C-alpha cells in the first residue's frame, strides 16, 4: 500500500474528514495502516513527533499535513522540519511555512463532502456555521442583521450543535450562508459545502475565496441585501459556483493529488519534492475547466 492517513480524532474534526477519511474512501485505503510506504500525519498534535520518529524507524516516508498556522509551537516546528514532505490546504499557509521554516509545501485542496443540491435561494433566511474561534467575525454584524432570520451552528453553548445530518437540514432551510472574517490561512471548505448544498455565499474578502466564481465577496451587508432581494440572479450565480466546485474540489481529484504526491515522496529524495513558486505547488493552480452560464 502506497499511503495511509493518520489522525487521532474522529469525524467531529473537520481535518479528520477533509484531510483523511474522504481521500481514504476514494483511494479505497484504510486510515492508520502502518504497513503503508508513506504516512500522512493529517493533524499535527503533541503526539506527532513520536509518530513521525516511529515511521522513520520503520523505514517509512512521512508527509506532514499542516492545517493550522501554529508555526511557533515546538512540536509543530519539529514535525515540519523532520517530515519528508509538507502539505497544506492553502497557498498562504504554504508561504508562511516557507518564510518561517524554509520548507516547501504542496497545496492540496480540501475536497467537498456534501452532495450537490439545486440552488434554492428564495428569501432571506441566513445560516452561519463554524467553530467558536470564528464567531467574532459574525458577532460584529449581528445587530445589523437583526431583521433577517439567522440560524447558527457551532460548538458554542446555546447554538445548534454540529452534525452532518444537522448541516443537511440547516442548509435546506437557508437561502444565504454567511462567511464573515476568519483566519486568512483557512481553506474555503465552508464556502464549498454551502455551494454544494444550494445556498448563496456572502463573504468578506478572504485569500481562499480568490477565483471562486459566483459568490458575493466584499460589502457584507450589501451582499446579504442583494441576494435576498434578487433570488433568481443569486441562483444563476450559484450555478456557476457549483460548476466550478464540482470539478476543482471533487474528492476523486483531491485523492489523486494525494496519491501523486505519495508516489513522488516514496521514490524521490525529500529535496526533490514539490519545489514550486514561493515554496509551494498546488493542484489549485492547474486549469479547471467547468461549464459557465
Label every model-predicted segment:
Residues 39, 86, 174-178, 200-201:
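Hydrophobic acceptor-binding patch used for acceptor engagement in glycosyltransferases
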Residues 133, 161-165, 169, 175-196, ...:
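Nucleotide-sugar-dependent
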Residues 26-97:
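Extended catalytic core of nucleotide-activated donor transferases of GT-like folds
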Residues 8-23, 114-116, 122-167, 190:
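Conserved catalytic-core segment of nucleotide-activated headgroup transferases in glycan assembly
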Residues 1-49, 251, 269, 291:
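N-terminal pre-catalytic "stem/leader" segment of glycosyltransferase-like enzymes
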Residues 84-98, 102-117:
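Donor nucleotide-sugar binding/catalytic pocket of nucleotide-sugar-dependent glycosyltransferases
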Residues 115, 123, 232-267, 276, ...:
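A charged, aromatic-enriched C-terminal amphipathic alpha-helix characteristic of glycosyltransferases
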Amino acid at each position: 500500500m502506497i499511503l495511509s492517513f493518520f489522525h487521532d480524532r474522529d469525524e467531529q474534526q473537520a481535518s479528520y474528514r477533509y484531510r483523511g477519511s474522504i481521500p481514504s474512501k476514494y483511494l479505497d485505503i484504510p486510515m492508520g495502516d502502518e504497513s503503508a510506504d508513506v504516512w500522512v500525519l493529517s493533524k499535527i498534535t503533541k503526539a506527532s513527533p513520536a509518530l513521525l520518529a516511529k515511521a522513520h524507524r520503520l523505514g517509512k516516508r512521512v508527509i506532514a499535513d499542516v492545517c493550522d498556522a501554529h508555526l511557533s509551537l515546538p512540536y509543530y516546528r519539529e514535525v515540519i522540519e523532520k517530515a519528508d514532505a509538507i502539505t497544506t490546504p492553502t497557498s498562504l499557509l504554504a508561504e508562511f511555512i516557507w518564510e518561517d521554516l524554509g520548507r516547501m509545501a504542496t497545496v492540496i485542496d480540501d475536497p467537498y463532502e456534501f452532495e450537490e443540491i439545486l440552488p434554492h435561494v428564495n428569501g432571506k433566511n441566513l445560516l452561519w456555521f463554524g467553530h467558536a474561534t470564528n464567531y467574532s467575525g459574525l458577532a460584529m454584524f449581528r445587530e445589523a442583521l437583526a431583521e433577517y432570520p439567522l440560524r447558527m451552528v457551532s460548538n458554542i453553548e446555546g447554538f445548534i450543535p454540529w452534525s452532518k445530518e444537522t448541516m443537511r437540514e440547516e442548509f435546506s432551510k437557508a437561502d444565504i450562508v454567511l462567511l464573515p472574517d476568519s483566519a486568512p490561512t483557512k481553506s474555503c471548505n465552508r464556502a464549498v459545502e454551502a455551494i454544494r448544498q444550494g445556498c448563496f455565499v456572502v463573504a468578506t474578502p478572504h485569500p481562499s475565496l480568490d477565483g471562486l466564481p459566483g459568490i458575493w465577496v466584499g460589502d457584507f451587508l450589501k451582499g446579504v441585501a442583494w441576494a435576498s432581494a434578487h433570488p433568481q440572479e443569486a441562483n444563476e450565480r450559484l450555478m456557476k459556483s457549483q460548476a466550478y466546485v464540482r470539478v476543482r474540489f471533487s474528492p476523486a481529484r483531491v485523492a489523486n493529488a494525494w496519491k501523486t504526491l505519495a508516489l513522488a515522496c516514496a521514490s524521490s529524495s525529500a529535496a526533490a519534492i514539490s519545489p514550486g513558486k514561493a515554496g509551494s505547488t498546488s493542484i489549485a493552480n492547474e486549469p479547471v475547466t467547468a461549464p459557465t452560464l
